[in-house]
Every structure is written in structure tokens, then in C-alpha cells.
């Protein structure tokens, strides 16, 4: 999707997105990511506008590999905490304030419906829980990304992911899974321990990463 939106921007053409996974907000946002050929993170880029329309079929999402919904939940959980952390203390214009307000609605719904959505993915069923979570992952976080500049959109959690792509680690780890661990780091750094513990318990129940070994970092030299 990121390649297509960049190609459309270069060609000056409108584009539409048809996500088959609920793994991140790429279908709705005008933000893309570049990687080097060795898969290490390079930079983000912004196109002039996001897709003209995003078509989401929850039956397709329900039948996609479960791990992408799982990682998408991990990615979306970061949005509220990263945006609120980055915007704290700033006087914001209307659009950015709207983004921060919307971000504040993201995590509770994911924590409330995430496990049911994953069970629906196991059963290949397009339940209300799966629809809610998929829209949160793709739409809510994408709209926020369109309202906020880069330095508000991501902070500690995504910085940890970006660094993770450049260090030796065991196994392959999806973007959202690593970002989810980074969110635990952010909440710890920011002293939001009650919120951190709530998220940690959710990660334990859903097997999202909640330790360095869960994202393949076990070598003391790499740490």
C-alpha cells in the first residue's frame, strides 16, 4: 500500500485502498515508510493526501492470517500513548487537538474487544468485535495520523521498533508486535505504571510481546 500511494503521488493520480489485513493504519493515512534492502528502517514520507476512499470488507479481514490482526492490535495500542506523550503541554491548533482527543479513545476499545476479535479471527467470523477492532486499527489510528505531524504521531514505541530493525535479533517479528513492547517501555518511562500494568496484563493474555526475549533480544552485547 505504501508503494502504491507513493506511485500515485508521483503520477499525480487519485488512489483508493482495499486492505486485506488489519495490521496497521496504512490504508487510511497519507504516511508511508521506506526501508533499505536489508529491511532496516530508513525514513517516513508524506504524500499530499490520503486515499480518496478505503474499502474494508470484514469478511476478508476475518479470513486473513490471524497474526496480522494480532500485531495490528499491538500497533494501534501505541497511538493513544504516543500522541498524548508527544503533545503534552503544547498549545494545539484545532486539527491537532482533534487528533489528540481522538487518540484518547483508541486503547480502551482495543483492550475491551481485542480478545473477542482474536477469537473471531480464529473462527474466521466477521463478528462485531472484529469489525470494531479492525476499524480502530485501520481507521481511527489512520485519521489521527492524518491530523498530526510526524513528531506527534510516534515517539518511544515506534523509535524502539525502528531501532529493532537495525540490530541483530532472533526470529522474525511483525511491526505491531515490536511496537506493542515499545508502548510498555513508553508507559514505564513516563511513569504511567497503572496503565502499563493494565496493558501488560492484556499482552500476557494475548501473547503480545512483553519482554525483550519476546522480540528476539537476548544477547547482552546487543542490549
Report each predicted region and the residues it spans:
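A glycine/threonine-rich phosphate-anchoring loop and its flanking beta-alpha core
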Residues: 10-102
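N-terminal small/polar loop signature for handling phosphorylated ligands or for N-terminal nucleophile
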Residues: 1-15, 116-129
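Active-site segments that bind and position negatively charged phosphate/pyrophosphate groups
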Residues: 93-201
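C-terminal charged capping/lid subdomain of soluble metabolic enzymes
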Residues: 192-223
